[in-house]
Amino acid sequence: MLGLVAGTCVGYLVQADRDPTPLTSLSQVTLTQAKGEAPEPLSAAQDRRVRTDGDLRKLLLKKPKGAKEADWLEGADGWMDLADYAADYDEPGNMFGSFLGSEFRRAAVTGWLAGDSSVEIRLVQYRQEETVAASEAAENGHYWAEREDGTESYPVPGTGDGMAYVHTKPFVELGGVSAYSARAFAWRGDIAMEIWVYDSKRISKQLIVDLAKRQMEQL
């Protein structure tokens, strides 16, 4: 054992007394720089994000020819802030906090009156940094619509899980007038779509499904 230790020490001393052996140089990989100009950014038609990060109001369906502008919409100039959006619910204070937690970003709204039929469309955008709130908002709409008696449901083509609902039983408005309603909910990316239709007569499946389909095609 002693001889092994001594031999190791001698070998170490000899090695320590030598000049260090120079290492061979490392070969450097030369990266070739791409020549020419950078590619052009995608247009709004090519990149959905370009559209949805712009003026959300431009993605709303246009008022049909002959229809009147809605004068009952919340918000101003086609925009709804968080307070405006929450104010449309039964418990605005609680809903304000709920939507704040859902990372509400902004909402665009439009509407019109055609004869006895009124239409309101909302595009609600979420930040979605912590949660997929747009899909959850659509699911919430489905839940409440399906709870009503006399409700017929129809898929919205091209949306995956988007649904339109026709309520076959009238409800009584504050003025004592009976009215029928239909609604639709769908989502794409960070935007949830809501459509509400009211009329003095039962609303057709074709009307609500067509509105929802065309609006989702804008997104």
Per-segment meaning from a language model:
Residues 1-2:
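N-terminal export and membrane-targeting signals
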Residues 130, 134-182:
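Short Gly/Thr-rich strand-loop-strand
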Residues 173-219:
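Extracytoplasmic/luminal low-complexity segments enriched in Pro/Gly and acidic/polar residues
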Residues 123-127, 138, 197-199, 212:
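A mature extracytoplasmic/lumenal domain signature
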Residues 106-135:
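A short acidic-to-branched-hydrophobic micro-motif
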Residues 111-112, 138-146, 215-219:
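Hydrophobic, Leu/Ile/Phe/Ala-enriched alpha-helical segments that form helix-helix packing faces
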Residues 18, 129-131, 203:
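Residue-level signal for secondary-structure boundary sites
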Residues 7-107:
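N-terminal "mature-domain start" segment
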